[in-house]
Amino acid sequence: MTAPWARRAACALAALALVLLFGTPAGAETDGDCLYTLIGPDGAALTQRAGRMYVGDEYIAGDDGWYRVASVDDAAQTATAEYLGRSTEDIPAFSAYAEGAKASKGDGDKLIAMYSTHSDESYLPGDGTASKWKGAGIYDVGDSLKQALEARGIKAVYSKETFLPHDADAYNRSRRTAEELLKQGPDALLDIHRDAVPAEQYETEVDGEDISKVRLFVGRNNQNAAENRAFAKQIKAAADEKYPGLIKDIFIGKGNYNQELYPHALLLEFGTHEIEKKKAMEAADYIADVLDNVLYGGSAKAEGAKGVKGGAVARGVGWAVGLAVLAAAVYALISTGGLKSAWHKLGRSVSEVTGGLFGDRKR
């Protein structure tokens, strides 16, 4: 018979394993239910976020100033940040993504996958409402990006699956779609959103055209966080060089946002609910050009992008399987009360969790 303290410890370990497997606590990925302001060391507002801020979150401003949240006042919905320096020092060289373009297989191999976790997001100017359960405006923006990519010879797959309601479990619901899209071996996996801050924060002019800025969002609680961040920073660097003002900033927040599934997974926020939808749709054309340059050198698929497919997916799957096995082991110990019985039960569980990947244990 297992001692009470052992059962409690085992339950705690099982809960931890499941949290790591299926994502951070739901509250860490609840967006749009509040408006937090980030205050810099000089007391001036740096940015706002339609969602909570947490100690440890990071922010890369449009001018590449790099900040980390040092304290949070949830009652006032404010956070204070410390200045860390310039974020440009460790940006990967542009050629790291595009130098293999000459040796690429051709246009037929270029593929970018997209979906929209917050399936109701819409634009007041254009949709007449900020939230639509059918025909949401965010899908018009995603379609614009898809068309712009395809115009450049890049195949784009945009899932129209919906994951309503817009709540803390939306990312859990969209995870299956993200996993299905990854089976096609895309060079990037993009979650298309819009923000919910005042419109003036996203208004910009690029090449004489009034369009919306785009925020890049990285989840910092996953094993691919460093690569997700590097990908976001490279996109910003390329955009800043060719289309200054297009990328608003990069927010690195608590949560995983399904980005643990792939190093080139990224969340993009096209404008805000108060900005004209047309401006967000027009921004998509510029983003498509930036993605083409970063991933394919503007003309062909980069070796760096190609190489990330198999290995990255395998690492992500292996990480998930390992955690699933850990959860199964703890559960077996709890339910059987002994190591010997638990071992036999674990063998059966591993086979079930992995789909027979490691074979069935003989009973």
Q: What residue ranges belong to the model's regions?
A:
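Bacterial N-terminal signal peptides
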Residues: A12-L21
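Sec-dependent signal peptide cleavage junction
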Residues: F22-T30
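Short, basic/aromatic beta-hairpin or loop at an interaction surface
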Residues: E29-G43
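Non-catalytic propeptide/linker segments at domain boundaries
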Residues: R49, G56-T117, S122-P125
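Catalytic-core regions of hydrolytic enzymes
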Residues: P125-Q201
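Membrane-proximal low-complexity regions enriched in glycine and acidic/polar residues
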Residues: R176-K183, D187-L266, E274
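Active-site-adjacent mobile loop/cap segments within catalytic or ligand-binding domains
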Residues: D249-A305
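C-terminal single-pass membrane-anchor helix
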Residues: G304-R363
